[in-house]
């Protein structure tokens, strides 16, 4: 075999000229111990708080505790195949998730991996999971309404775009149902929705996805799921990841609605991680910074100034109470962070009042400014009316004889409570709500039997759609309730009463 020395020399010369003297310098550590979703690593002395690290099995971790001789890392993935003595690489980057239109309609885990069997998310857009919330100067007041389609909420505790409204109550009292109804009502409103399931049973998440698909809501919704079987670090990261995806739309001038279901379980996951990391426990064994864990999350929901595009994130955090104990640590923390709360009461729920919102202690601190003028006009005295009714109802139970005026007030109260009941997954438009509440507060239901109220309302709205469709379109187009429109509502109700056939006479 003959060698061509000139050819070998030219190849060597070309290789030397093309040689790129880049050295990939990475800090490498060693796993000292691992278990329960966390690892203690020796050797990563230059790692930053929140920096990503990579384990030998490909799992990603976050530097959580920076100690003198070791680093506490939370593992965002499979920790069962990580062993003591394995190598850990610092990646020099912060955790980020995919964002943009590609995530809409998908069911993802908190890292953006698909859970719906539709393949990876095809996008080049990513957003950091943790960012500092926008400052006061970069925001504007909440002025646009975000309609939930639920009469009791839109009339008494209205929500505006950019608001944080807490939904709080015991388990199985319809908290998730309120949030899902709010998502369903965003159809055609240009609002992107994010449902973040934290510590929920996989079967419960699957049923929520099924409801969203059946009602066509997955076209504008993303579900981020960290189920009950997911490691605590994933449950902890899930709300931040979902918010990061929503921020893409907010910073591009769009609007997003984020549901955190629920933050009690995120707090429990954070407590578990902190105790395993030997952080000192505080009240109810939660770490001292659990308030900051929730405040830095919820402060990212805002209404941006016009200079930044005027986008918004509206959030509906959910908190589960035990035996109605709203004065516990996590509930009081989140109540103080949010702009109001919807308190759902078990007694109301089991007596058939659904949604089971207690109007006495449910408030919206900033949503009133966002309420439409028509809704504000018809629902102005509704909260006081219902509060007075509850007091009268308690008084009437003593068996005292009531004068006719008090009895009439009590009877109207029963009808208003019945009117504010609403079946699940049947949100109403603002125009329909205005007609319905106007008829109730102005005494047009006083001669309708209490048991008939819901049927009367349903048939009335159908009648208005069929015979007075211009009234619906005028109410939708005009924010204020003029005297002329009010007269048309009264005329439509009176006209409907002539054709309405009650099943039972008025009580």
Swiss-Prot record:
CDD domains, A to Z: ATP-synt_F1_alpha_C, ATP-synt_F1_alpha_N, F1-ATPase_alpha_CD
Sites where the protein binds ATP: 169-176
Keyword Lyase: no
UniProt subcellular location: Cell inner membrane
GO molecular-function terms, A-Z: ADP binding; ATP binding; proton-transporting ATP synthase activity, rotational mechanism
GO BP term, example: proton motive force-driven ATP synthesis
Keywords: ATP synthesis, ATP-binding, Cell inner membrane, Cell membrane, CF(1), Hydrogen ion transport, Ion transport, Membrane, Nucleotide-binding, Translocase, Transport
Primary location group: membrane
GO CC terms, sorted: plasma membrane; proton-transporting ATP synthase complex
Bilayer topology term: Peripheral membrane protein
Record-marked site positions (Required for activity): 362
EC main group: translocase
InterPro entries in the record: ATP_synth_asu-like_sf, ATP_synth_asu_C, ATP_synth_asu_C_sf, ATP_synth_F1_a_nt-bd_dom, ATP_synth_F1_asu, ATPase_F1/V1/A1_a/bsu_N, ATPase_F1/V1/A1_a/bsu_N_sf, ATPase_F1/V1/A1_a/bsu_nucl-bd
Annotated catalysed reactions: ATP + H2O + 4 H(+)(in) = ADP + phosphate + 5 H(+)(out)
EC numbers on record: 7.1.2.2
Pfam families named in the record: ATP-synt_ab (PF00006), ATP-synt_ab_C (PF00306), ATP-synt_ab_N (PF02874)
Domain of life, source organism: Bacteria
UniProt family annotation: Belongs to the ATPase alpha/beta chains family.
Described function: Produces ATP from ADP in the presence of a proton gradient across the membrane. The alpha chain is a regulatory subunit.
SUBUNIT field: F-type ATPases have 2 components, CF(1) - the catalytic core - and CF(0) - the membrane proton channel. CF(1) has five subunits: alpha(3), beta(3), gamma(1), delta(1), epsilon(1). CF(0) has three main subunits: a(1), b(2) and c(9-12). The alpha and beta chains form an alternating ring which encloses part of the gamma chain. CF(1) is attached to CF(0) by a central stalk formed by the gamma and epsilon chains, while a peripheral stalk is formed by the delta and b chains.
Name of the protein in its database record: ATP synthase subunit alpha 2
Species: Rhodopirellula baltica (strain DSM 10527 / NCIMB 13988 / SH1)
């Amino acid at each position: 075999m003959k060698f061509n020395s000139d050819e070998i020399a030219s190849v060597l010369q070309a290789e030397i000229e093309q040689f790129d003297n880049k050295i990939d310098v990475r800090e490498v550590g060693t796993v000292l111990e691992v278990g329960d979703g966390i690892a203690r690593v020796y050797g990563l002395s230059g790692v930053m708080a929140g920096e990503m690290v990579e384990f030998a099995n490909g799992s990603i971790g976050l530097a959580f505790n920076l100690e003198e001789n070791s680093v506490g890392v939370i593992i965002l993935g499979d920790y069962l195949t990580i062993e003591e003595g394995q190598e850990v690489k610092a990646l020099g980057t912060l955790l980020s998730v995919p964002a943009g239109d590609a995530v809409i309609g998908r069911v993802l885990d908190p890292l953006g991996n698909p859970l719906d069997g539709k393949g990876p998310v095809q996008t080049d857009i990513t957003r950091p999971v943790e960012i500092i919330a926008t400052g006061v100067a970069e925001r504007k007041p909440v002025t646009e309404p975000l309609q939930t389609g639920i009469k009791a909420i839109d009339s008494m505790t209205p929500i505006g775009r950019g608001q944080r409204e807490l939904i709080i109550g015991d388990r199985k009292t319809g908290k998730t149902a309120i949030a899902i109804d709010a998502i369903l009502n965003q159809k055609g409103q240009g609002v992107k929705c994010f449902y973040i399931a934290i510590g929920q049973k996989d079967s419960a998440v699957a049923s929520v996805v099924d409801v969203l698909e059946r009602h066509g809501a997955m076209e504008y919704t993303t579900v981020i799921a960290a189920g009950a079987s997911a490691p605590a670090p994933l449950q902890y990261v899930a709300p931040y990841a979902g918010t990061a995806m929503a921020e893409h739309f907010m910073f591009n001038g769009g609007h997003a609605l984020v549901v955190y279901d629920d933050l009690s379980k995120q707090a429990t996951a954070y407590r578990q991680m902190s105790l395993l990391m030997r952080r000192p426990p505080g009240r109810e064994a939660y770490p001292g910074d659990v308030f900051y864990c929730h405040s830095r999350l919820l402060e990212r929901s805002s209404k941006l100034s016009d200079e930044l595009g005027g986008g918004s994130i509206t959030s509906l955090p959910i908190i589960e109470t035990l035996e109605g104990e709203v004065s516990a640590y996590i509930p009081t923390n989140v109540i103080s962070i949010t702009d109001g709360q919807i308190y759902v009461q078990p007694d109301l729920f089991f007596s058939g009042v659904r949604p089971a919102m207690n109007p006495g202690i449910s408030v919206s601190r900033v949503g009133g400014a966002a309420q439409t003028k028509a809704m504000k006009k018809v629902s102005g005295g509704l909260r006081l009316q219902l509060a007075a009714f509850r007091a009268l109802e308690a008084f009437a139970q003593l068996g005292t004889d009531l004068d006719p005026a008090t009895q009439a007030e009590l009877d109207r109260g029963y009808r208003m409570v019945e009117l504010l009941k609403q079946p699940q997954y049947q949100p109403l438009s603002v125009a329909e709500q205005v007609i319905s509440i106007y008829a109730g507060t102005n005494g047009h239901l006083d001669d309708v039997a209490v048991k008939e109220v819901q049927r009367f309302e349903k048939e009335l709205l159908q009648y208005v759609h069929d015979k007075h469709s211009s009234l619906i379109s005028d109410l939708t187009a005009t924010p204020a309730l003029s005297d002329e429109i009010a007269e048309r509502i009264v005329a439509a109700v009176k006209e409907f009463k002539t054709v309405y056939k009650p099943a039972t006479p008025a009580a």
